[in-house]
């Protein structure tokens, strides 16, 4: 019998326990032996839980029990999760996690520890929730050089933007609905709406693609707080919708660029039709071309099912599972991983007349004049040109309120 421990009994942790209980026979068949939860570590009081005898508060109980083969980490964050996971791997126990912050920050180190101590560190649920993407990318696409990853990886902001488009809601109203439905945190939704969640996910995928650690702090990140109903309407005039896009590109010289930003997505682009809490990630390989991974990116049971699938793999294959899943440690780079390539942009400028905006930004057209300024579509510019234009706007008493890159019509 394989005995496991669960660290954290919040949304995902309780989901993992539920999946293991409801589908016990199926999980055991796939693992090749019965699977049993022996401990659940959580500081809260679960004395009224039907399985209260499983709950413990001392991590050392798990570490000192030789029967524990696999540890599931669903605490989140890094303060407790990182030292606990590190200790488990150093003791030769495999770890399965959904913790994107920990993987994005310490992935290379933890993968190295797993390899050193003959166990596995698995994190399928950290990027796509219940939608598989880590395993397909490093196994099914192993014959490809991946040059680009681009997609919608945060279900909360995608739900909010869908509401803003379909129901003409403002940011605050869309956020309130997302919170009422449990898609956004009630106390502090900033990880989602400010893009940090998406940033961690694209950092993980970038590390996987590039073979060395790419850190979230080096990825330019903007969220959706600045998006207004007027921007949504202007996007419609341009034949686009607004989506929060996470992306990375790898040049032929090995250079890496990455970012998280709200973008104009033309309706002909397949990402434009990805709505509500669904995610979609487009991966470009040199041999296969484009592959899209699509599904619900979050949710208790979808995410838990991905974690349990990792548990099965760890039990069945041990240190051999996904042994090619590895990237090298690296120091954070100086500066940001920006993309120098030119693109079309939507800019919203306040405080100066449309004619002045047109004179500053050059070739393009006014989209909306309802502001004390205007919304302007720039046909072609790079980040350096946009920064120079912003300085000129400020020099004449204006301010740039929003900049949105337009994606190509076809991926």
Map each language-model feature to its residues:
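A short hydrophobic/small-residue beta-strand
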Residues: 94-96
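Flexible, glycine/charged-enriched surface loops at secondary-structure junctions
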Residues: 34, 188, 192, 213-221, ...
């Amino acid at each position: 019998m394989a005995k496991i421990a669960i660290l954290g009994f919040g949304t995902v942790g309780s989901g993992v326990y539920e999946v293991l209980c409801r589908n016990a026979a199926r999980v055991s068949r796939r693992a090749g032996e019965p699977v049993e939860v022996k401990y659940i570590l959580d500081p809260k009081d679960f004395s009224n839980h039907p399985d209260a005898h499983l709950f413990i508060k001392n991590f050392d109980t798990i570490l000192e029990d030789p029967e524990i083969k696999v540890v599931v980490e669903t605490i989140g964050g890094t303060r407790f999760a990182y030292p606990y996971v590190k200790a488990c791997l150093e003791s030769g126990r495999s770890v399965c996690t959904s913790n994107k912050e920990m993987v994005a920050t310490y992935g290379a180190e933890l993968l190295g520890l797993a390899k050193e101590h003959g166990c596995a560190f698995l994190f399928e649920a950290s990027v796509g929730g219940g939608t598989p993407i880590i395993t397909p990318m490093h196994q099914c696409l192993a014959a490809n050089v991946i040059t680009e990853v681009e997609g919608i990886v945060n279900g909360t902001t995608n739900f909010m933007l869908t509401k803003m488009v379909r129901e003409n809601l403002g940011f605050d109203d869309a956020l309130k609905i997302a919170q009422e439905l449990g898609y956004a945190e009630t106390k502090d939704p900033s990880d989602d709406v400010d893009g940090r969640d998406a940033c961690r996910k694209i950092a993980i995928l970038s590390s996987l693609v590039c073979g060395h650690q790419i850190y979230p702090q080096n990825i330019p990140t903007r969220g959706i707080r600045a998006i207004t109903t007027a921007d949504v309407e202007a996007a419609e005039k341009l034949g686009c919708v607004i989506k929060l896009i996470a992306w990375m590109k790898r040049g032929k010289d090995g250079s890496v660029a990455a970012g998280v930003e709200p973008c104009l997505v033309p309706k002909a682009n397949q990402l434009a039709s990805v709505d509500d809490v669904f995610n979609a990630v487009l991966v470009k390989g040199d041999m296969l071309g484009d592959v899209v991974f699509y599904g619900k990116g979050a949710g208790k049971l979808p995410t838990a099912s991905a974690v349990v699938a990792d548990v099965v793999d760890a039990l069945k294959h041990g240190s051999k599972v996904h042994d090619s899943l590895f990237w090298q440690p690296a120091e954070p780079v100086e500066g940001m991983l920006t993309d120098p390539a030119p693109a079309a942009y939507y800019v919203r400028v306040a405080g100066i007349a449309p004619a002045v905006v047109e004179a500053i930004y050059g070739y393009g057209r006014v989209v909306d004049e309802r502001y004390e300024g205007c919304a302007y579509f720039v046909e072609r510019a790079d980040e350096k040109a946009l920064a120079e234009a912003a300085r000129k706007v400020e020099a004449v008493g204006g301010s740039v309120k929003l900049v949105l890159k337009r994606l190509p019509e076809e991926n």
